[in-house]
Amino acid sequence: MLSRRQLIPIATKSVSPFLRSSITCRRISMGRKELSEKDSNILDSVIRVDQAGELGANQIYKGQHFILQFTDPKVAPTIQHMWDQEKYHLATFDNYVLKNRVRPTFLRPFWDIAGFALGAGTALLGTKAAMACTEAVETVIGGHYNDQLRETAHLENKAPEFKEIRSHLAEFRDDELEHLNTAVEGWNAKEAPAHALLTNAIQMGCKAAIWMCKRF
């Protein structure tokens, strides 16, 4: 398993989604074990969706940091810390995509733009609005990781790689919930203007993104 220090640079390298999409693999070879088609499809979905999700999160924090480093410098280190964790998450799933020959979502270019726009846009509304965005996103993603851990529980003993992936799912879930707590308890996210409207809209967008990445 690569360390965080080794993995973070991978996240900065862009591999053409068109090249990746040309790779087809109905059965994914995990080490020396051959998975069934059903298990391969589960693995494929987990990796594809989570890579896309971590890309979006990475871009959200990038957009927030781009604005808040100037408008509210005192929060910039907190944003940077959360962003660094998302870089590691993304690098981990980028590595899984390449290792397991998983086709990334066709929507990756869109998430690049949409994530940054969401991060920068909420930051322009102020620090509390940016933190409300974090609260909304991490609430959905934390629940999403919990769903995946339940969905893949029966696979853990089928191959060592499943145990490794599930350990990352649990680790990243805990990181996302830490971000949620930071936003709510540390930076008063719930005091953001139109908090309920903002967070509900963002959560609906996140759930729609997960649905689309599972299919495209």
Swiss-Prot record:
InterPro entries the UniProt entry points to = Ferritin-like_SF (IPR009078), Ubq_synth_Coq7 (IPR011566)
Subcellular location(s): the record lists:
Mitochondrion inner membrane
Q: Where is the transit peptide?
A: 1-27
- Report residues binding Fe cation 2: E86, E138, E176, H179
Q: Which GO terms describe its cellular component?
A: extrinsic component of mitochondrial inner membrane; mitochondrial inner membrane; mitochondrion
Keyword Cytoplasm in record: no
Q: Where does Fe cation 1 bind?
A: E54, E86, H89, E176
How the cofactor binds, per note?
Binds 2 iron ions per subunit.
**Which pathway does the UniProt entry assign to this protein?**
Cofactor biosynthesis; ubiquinone biosynthesis
Write down the EC number.
1.14.99.60, 1.14.13.253
Reaction catalyzed: a 5-methoxy-2-methyl-3-(all-trans-polyprenyl)benzene-1,4-diol + AH2 + O2 = a 3-demethylubiquinol + A + H2O; a 5-methoxy-2-methyl-3-(all-trans-polyprenyl)benzoquinone + NADH + O2 = a 3-demethylubiquinone + NAD(+) + H2O
Cofactor(s) this protein cannot do without: Fe cation
- Subunit-level organization: Component of a multi-subunit COQ enzyme complex, composed of at least COQ3, COQ4, COQ5, COQ6, COQ7 and COQ9.
Q: What does this protein do?
A: Catalyzes the hydroxylation of 2-polyprenyl-3-methyl-6-methoxy-1,4-benzoquinol (DMQH2) during ubiquinone biosynthesis. Also catalyzes the hydroxylation of the 5-methoxy-2-methyl-3-(all-trans-polyprenyl)benzoquinone at the C6 position and participates in the biosynthesis of ubiquinone.
Q: This protein is called what?
A: 5-demethoxyubiquinone hydroxylase, mitochondrial
Q: Which organism is it from?
A: Schizosaccharomyces pombe (strain 972 / ATCC 24843) (Fission yeast)
The taxonomy runs: Eukaryota, Fungi, Dikarya, Ascomycota, Taphrinomycotina
- The protein's gene is named coq7
